[in-house]
C-alpha cells in the first residue's frame, strides 16, 4: 500500500503520506487506560500518544483551586483544569494548542486568573449539553489521539486526616496545613464512576 501511495502522491505531499501511515500505525496500537491527574498524567500522555492512539485517560476531578475552582463554584461543573492538561497533551497539534489552551488572563482583566482552556471546555460543555459531550467535541477540535474521560461527574472533594487528628477538606487547602498526612479520601465517599471510565478500564489490554 505504501508504494502505491508514494507513486500517486506528488513529492510535496510526502508529509501527508507520513501522517496517514502514522495514524494507521497508532490505530493498531494497544488499548491503554491510565488513571490520574495533575501534571504527572499529562506528562505521561505526551509520550504515550506516539505509541498508540487507543489511549484513554481517566482523570480525577477533585481540584478546587484557581480557575478550575472558580468555574466549579460559579457554574456547577466538574473542574476542567486536569482535563484540559490531558487534552493538550494528547492533541496532534500540541505546540500551537498548548499556547492557546494554556493561556491565562492577566491581572486587570475581568477574567484575571482564568485559563482560556478552562473557559473553552466550560463553554463546550454548556453548548453540547454535558461535560462528557463537551470533552468529546473539544477532542475533535484539537485532533486528540485517544480519549479524555472524567472519573466521575459528581461534585467530589478531597479530604485528609493529619497525624495529629486534624481533618482538612479541599485539595487546595491540604498543602497549606504543613502537616503529615495519615490518610486521604473523598467526600462523599460513595460517588459513581462514569460509565465511559469503567468501560475504558474493562477494555484495556
What does each of the following model-derived ranges do?
Residues 40-44, 65-68:
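Short N-terminal binding/cap micro-motifs at the start of the first secondary-structure element
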Residues 34-36, 115:
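Short glycine/serine/threonine-biased micro-segments
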Residues 59-132, 137-142, 147:
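Glycine-rich nucleotide/cofactor/substrate-binding loop typically near the N-terminus or early
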Residues 47-54, 74-78:
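A glycine- and small-aliphatic-rich helix-loop capping segment at beta-alpha/alpha-beta transitions
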Residues 35, 49-50, 57-62:
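Gly/serine-rich nucleotide phosphate-binding loop at the start of the catalytic core
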Residues 1-31, 39, 43, 52-57, ...:
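Conserved catalytic alpha/beta core of Sir2/sirtuin-type deacylases, generalized to analogous enzyme cores
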Residues 36-37, 79:
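Short coil/turn residues that cap or connect secondary-structure elements
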